């Protein structure tokens, strides 16, 4: 029934455009059954809806959405977009130089999820009418990420994707064994989904893997986490931390980024990063060093020189591309050197002793002044001598002679 309707529509349209009802008798028209194709597009990218026909004169092309909305119209050798639905304005065009060769494909710019659906192309020529159906499906898969977070005393791995459509398949593995994860956080909109999938790994030394799959786009992303054994170093020493990509995920022809970070107060500060696309290396820590020869061999191990006590903590190497994220974490414990420890021990003894001595001195001075003030108030005449005398409590200063003579040895008196 639909085919008959389409045929009648084009017979009327073509004959009316030719200016004569009798130029193309009905017997000369050939109806070609509808073909159906599926086209998959990505959000905000351009696509082509294919349609072809046998070459003929007086070509008429109409593209419609859901058989109702006019997407694009072409006849008499040019576009006629007066009745085009506004949502398609400035987004569609034909391959005009190829129409004469039987190409009625539609170039579609910046597709959105609202563009999903069935598109029908009606093509009429002087001798035939064809209809081609195209089913457009649109997918979204912004690059996911794997993050490591500290929440109070707990450690979490989080696999997240900011925008994805349709709803993805997320799986977790621990030491290559599938595990269940029931804490997925999902927010949806008309355009896409935003998904976070956290996993508590507190106290675990296992390796973890998260996979996010978009079945429509046939695209899979993998995040992998590995914890290395803890390292104990002395102050002023240096430490070497390994970071190498896994061959199963790494592709040398694919752009990627490497970032080394150190965690302090629950947040990571970037020590250095490397961009494969530009071979550019940025180092934010003067004691950090990379071996360029190793980098050329895809080995991103690093050295940190002249360690100090504040360097204790977690160090994270992140290798990321559009298809994977590889996280490697090291825990470094920096301990005081023996010289520093002995020095600190001496300070622990010396400082309290000095504080005690200072306290006793201050106390003695205060006591002495109090005694002098008390004696001055009882014997004002002896004030000058009392100011020069300070004795322990319970004792008195020697009394001055009553006759005013100077104190001399008894043997010196006449």
Swiss-Prot record:
It is a single-pass type I membrane protein. InterPro entries: Ig-like_dom, Ig-like_dom_sf, Ig-like_fold, Ig_C1-set, Ig_sub, Ig_V-set, IgSF_BTN/MOG. Interacts with TMIGD2. Residues 138-222 form the Ig-like C1-type domain. Through interaction with TMIGD2, costimulates T-cells in the context of TCR-mediated activation. Enhances T-cell proliferation and cytokine production via an AKT-dependent signaling cascade. Glycans are attached at residues 90, 103, 318. Residues 1-22 form the signal peptide. GO terms for cellular component: external side of plasma membrane. Keywords: Disulfide bond, Glycoprotein, Immunoglobulin domain, Membrane, Repeat, Signal, Transmembrane, Transmembrane helix. GO terms for molecular function: signaling receptor binding. The chain crosses the membrane at residues 345-365. Expressed at high levels in colon, kidney, testis, lung and pancreas, and at lower levels in small intestine, liver and skeletal muscle. In immune cells, highly expressed in B-cells, dendritic cells and macrophages. Not detected in T-cells. Residues 383-414 are annotated as: Disordered. It holds the Pfam family C1-set. GO terms for biological process: positive regulation of activated T cell proliferation; positive regulation of cytokine production; regulation of cytokine production; T cell costimulation; T cell receptor signaling pathway. It is found in: Membrane. Its main location: membrane. This is HERV-H LTR-associating protein 2. Residues 61-131, 235-328 form the Ig-like V-type domain. Disulfide bonds join 159-210, 243-317. Induction: Up-regulated in antigen-presenting cells in response to inflammation. Induced in dendritic cells in response to IFNG, poly(I:C) or heat-killed Listeria monocytogenes (at protein level).
